[in-house]
Amino acid sequence: GAGGALFAMRRSLYPTIPIDLLDDMIASISPIFSGHRVVSVPDVYAFERATSDSADEFRRKRRIACRAFNTHRFLAPQLRTMGLLNRFKYVSHKYIRWFSAAFLLLWLLFTFIAIVSLAGIVAATVTALAGVLLLVLGLRFNLPLIGTLVEIFMSILATGLGVLEALAGRSYQTWTPAKSRRD
């Protein structure tokens, strides 16, 4: 689906959307279900204010992931009717993002198991502790690469928690735009 900042569509194609779901996602993908095209225009830009607070950004990503996954479940019967190319685009864009936390946890677990099997439990534990220490020191001394890695990890974690909330039956109906430094 299109981003909520800016998209346009024919009024006749605009669907009825439940209040707790992502209207921009449903509205912008619905034309495909009725055989219409969705196009992107490269010379149109939209700007949104971004938050400068990591905690606000974490909550925002978590809320959006919960609503997006609930929206996916709402759209599932129609998604199955899409052609293979559109279904591939949808799955490769959405599923990988939603389940990145699970993939990351599995990667960490299997990496730890591999190190245990190759070098022993002590080496695996030392490697894990060294990784944690590197992250802590990088954040403490404000190393840009470490900060970027932590932000990526937090984004993946927020998305994973949002999906878990959706699977547990949680929904969000209202939201407050994040405050930015410009407010």
Language-model-derived ranges and their functions:
Residues L106-I113, L133-V136, V163:
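Alpha-helical transmembrane segments of multipass membrane proteins
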Residues I19-Y90, L161-E165:
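Catalytic donor/gating beta->alpha subdomain of glycosyltransferases that bind UDP-sugars
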Residues S12-L13, Y45, Y95:
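Short, well-ordered alpha-helical scaffold segment located
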Residues R60-T125, L145-T148, R170-D183:
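Basic/Trp-rich segment in TM-proximal cytosolic loops or flexible interdomain/linker regions
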